[in-house]
Amino acid sequence: MKIVAHRGYSGKYPELSSLAFEKALDLPIHGVECDVRLTRDGKVVVQHDPTLDRTAGRPGRISKLDWEELRGVDIGRGQRMMLLDELLELLEGKPHHLYIETKHP
């Protein structure tokens, strides 16, 4: 059996944020799970929902926005949305597995 932090340490920190992943990696787990979506300009962002409504409290569909429009959006406690590349950098050199679920617009 493998223990995986779903959306990072999402029970305590804003889901899918760098803080949630950093804190999850401090736990005795085997890996982390994330969801990814494409922005209008083709960037791969770490985001579960198709819109910003629930996580950021504002309207906006991920697939209809460019990364420049999304990069500054607060997803809770001052945390910002991540690119998949940023999450990969965070995990580099660590023994943890990364489970990626792709989402569609």
Feature locations, PLM:
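Phosphate-group recognition and catalysis centered on beta-loop-alpha active-site segments
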Residues: 1-105
